[in-house]
Swiss-Prot record:
Similarity remark: Belongs to the AdoMet synthase family.
Entry binding sites for K(+): 44
Name of the protein described by the UniProt record: S-adenosylmethionine synthase
EC class: transferase
GO cellular component: cytoplasm
Primary role: Catalyzes the formation of S-adenosylmethionine (AdoMet) from methionine and ATP. The overall synthetic reaction is composed of two sequential steps, AdoMet formation and the subsequent tripolyphosphate hydrolysis which occurs prior to release of AdoMet from the enzyme.
Designated gene of the protein: metK
Keyword Phosphoprotein: no
Its EC number(s): 2.5.1.6
Length: 394
């Protein structure tokens, strides 16, 4: 048991420079998967004042007009000449090469396949070595930590009001941060502080911004029961946020990996998601680990669980599967590991088949987090393994 403590997580809007880059990378990935589901894509994007640079390694039968995808993505986010990033005039440089044949030979034909294994799901090897984590907790309905859930909700609301024109002076760049107080049983009891910074037109007053953001965003998103007289609210604490987006800060694919996952509440293996096809276990195995963790908690095997998977490049089977329930499990962790091995195929081809990952579903994950989403249908958020896991409680 620990004393009362605080935990903080942040989120950013779809117009944050790093998220622009993530969305462009995933929009390119989706465009390729739409034409060729077997596309191999590792696409990185950099955005800065007046410039988008797209680099990476791609092997595909698809033809994609990269310039058009880039400009369309920027326009959809809502950037204009006035807000500092004009989709029509921004320079777009593309430097894409083919996937390395040395990597391709290990992905196309795994170590197991080279050793005469005939199982078709053993054919694809992991695209890289590394470890990936998945997490779930029962403190929210979407099995996510409360701080990151609230931070994402604030950003979704901010972007929604901007797109609808309900707060007319908002521009696309924004950030939110939420600090939650936990009691000595580790249950969330209140919101201690909220920080929201929104980019805005130059002719609006700070007082109007603070009034609107608190009333129309913060107070509508955060449950009243979690707010009290001691909750601290900070709206645009610098006093001015006119210059934003790539005009103020350069952005890069994969630089918001904690926002993308659990807000720091769980560990992270270090690999980013956006711009990568599902043979890259950085992405697909992280999705599988979340899928496992969410179903384990939903089945009542634990109140919180962190699942670690690890891979060797060119090898299909994971080199390790590890479970940590933080003392909250209803059964032993060995039983949970057994349940995982018996119910989840964790070879790359098995994950791709299990979660149907050759589809163009990725751009929608590139803002507001990849996990705990209720606004879009993501296969790794499904609870279709709960029934199979219930038998392990006996």
């Amino acid at each position: 048991m620990q004393e009362r403590h605080l935990f903080t997580s942040e989120s950013v809007s779809e117009g944050h420079p790093d998220k622009i880059a993530d969305q462009i990378s995933d929009a390119i990935l989706d465009a390729m998967l739409e034409q060729d589901p077997d596309s191999r894509v590792a696409c990185e994007t950099t955005v800065t004042t007046g410039l988008v640079l797209v680099v990476g390694e791609i092997s595909t039968k698809a033809y994609v007009d990269i310039q058009s995808v880039v400009r369309g993505t920027i326009k959809k986010i809502g950037y204009t000449k006035e807000s500092g990033f004009d989709p029509d005039s921004v320079g777009v440089l593309v430097a894409l090469d083919e996937q390395s044949p040395d990597i391709a030979q290990g992905v196309d034909e795994s170590l197991e396949a080279r050793e005469s294994d005939t199982d078709p799901l053993d054919k694809i090897g992991a695209g890289d070595q590394g470890m990936m984590f998945g997490f779930a907790i029962d403190e929210t309905e979407n099995y996510m930590p409360l701080p990151i859930s609230l931070a994402h909700a604030l950003m979704r609301k901010t972007d929604s009001l901007r797109h609808k024109g309900e707060i007319s002076y908002l521009r696309p760049d924004a950030k939110a941060q939420v600090t939650v107080e936990y009691d000595d049983d580790d249950n969330p009891i209140r919101v201690d502080s909220v920080v929201v910074s929104v980019q805005h037109d130059p002719d609006v007053t700070l007082e109007e911004i603070r009034r609107d953001v608190e009333a129309k965003i913060i107070r509508t998103v955060i449950p009243e029961a979690l707010m009290d007289d001691d909750t601290k609210i900070y709206v645009n604490p610098t006093g001015r946020f006119v210059l934003g987006g790539p005009q103020a800060d350069s952005g890069l694919t994969g630089r918001k990996i904690i926002v993308d996952t659990y807000g720091g509440f769980a560990r992270h293996g270090g690999g980013a998601f956006s711009g990568k096809d599902a043979t890259k276990v950085d992405r697909s195995a992280s999705y599988a680990a979340r899928y496992i963790a969410k179903n384990v908690v939903a089945a009542g095997l634990a109140k919180r669980v962190e699942v670690q998977l690890a891979y060797a490049i060119g090898v299909a089977k994971p080199v390790s599967v590890s479970v940590n329930t933080f003392g909250t499990s209803a059964v032993s962790e060995d039983v949970i590991e057994q349940a995982i091995r018996e119910n989840f195929d964790l070879r790359p081809a098995g994950i791709i088949k299990m979660l149907d990952l050759k589809r163009p579903i990725y751009e929608q994950t590139a803002a507001y987090g990849h996990f705990g989403r209720t606004d879009v249908d993501l296969p790794w958020e499904h609870l279709d393994k709960v029934q199979a896991l219930l038998k392990y409680r006996d």
